[in-house]
A protein has these predicted regions:
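His/Met- and acidic-residue-enriched segments that coordinate or traffic transition-metal cofactors
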Residues: 2-6, 19-186
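N-terminal signal peptide c-region/cleavage motif recognized by signal peptidases
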Residues: 14-16
Length: 186
């Protein structure tokens, strides 16, 4: 009986670890500063680009002037990086599968944005953009330093400055929010 209890306890402890998603694995890798595998990197980048494009298309419809301007830049730039990544994969330089849809985490964020309006939309959108770009910069830095595919590693290094600029733009947009909100109330 005691062995059964111990075995059950071990399974209960191990189950969450076995059920980790790619994002959680790369989250742990991020904390440790470890480069993701090529397949994890490709998947995370593709999902990130899809999220950036879709959330920014919403901002083009629902956002204020500053959010719309930022969103237009994000749609342009992330469409470009998506096309480049697809070219690396389809050209055979990178052996990985590209996801065709958002994962559940990003889909729920997108659904939250779809439901928001006005200043609530702007606050959510801006917060999500800062967070997404911090994650992207970290992901690209780690792969550019320690990735195992030379072509993808080179691309990550070349793409990184644009992502760092996006992060700065998102942070500036976030800093401008309280001032814009106060100005709108007058």
């Amino acid at each position: 009986m005691r062995r059964i209890l111990i075995a059950t306890a071990c399974l209960m402890i191990a189950a969450p670890a076995l059920a980790q998603s790619v994002g959680e694995k790369t989250g742990v890798n991020s904390m440790l500063g470890v480069s993701p595998s090529t397949s994890d990197f490709v998947k995370e980048v593709a999902i990130s680009d899809m999220f950036e494009i879709e959330s920014s298309k919403l901002a083009q419809q629902k956002g204020n002037a500053a959010e719309k301007s930022f969103a237009s830049q994000m749609v342009t730039d992330h469409t470009k990086t998506s096309t480049e990544l697809k070219g690396l994969v389809s050209g055979g330089k990178v052996k990985a599968e590209l996801p065709t849809a958002l994962d559940s985490s990003h889909q729920s964020k997108l659904d939250k944005l779809k439901a928001a309006s006005g200043t609530d939309f702007g606050a959510e959108f801006t917060s999500m953009q800062v967070s997404a770009h911090k994650d992207a910069v970290d992901l690209f830095e780690r792969y550019a330093k320690g990735g195992d595919n030379p072509a993808l590693k080179d691309w990550a290094g070349k793409t990184l400055p644009a992502l760092q600029h996006h992060l700065q733009m998102a942070q500036d947009l976030d800093k401008a929010r309280p001032a814009a909100t106060i100005g709108e109330r007058r």
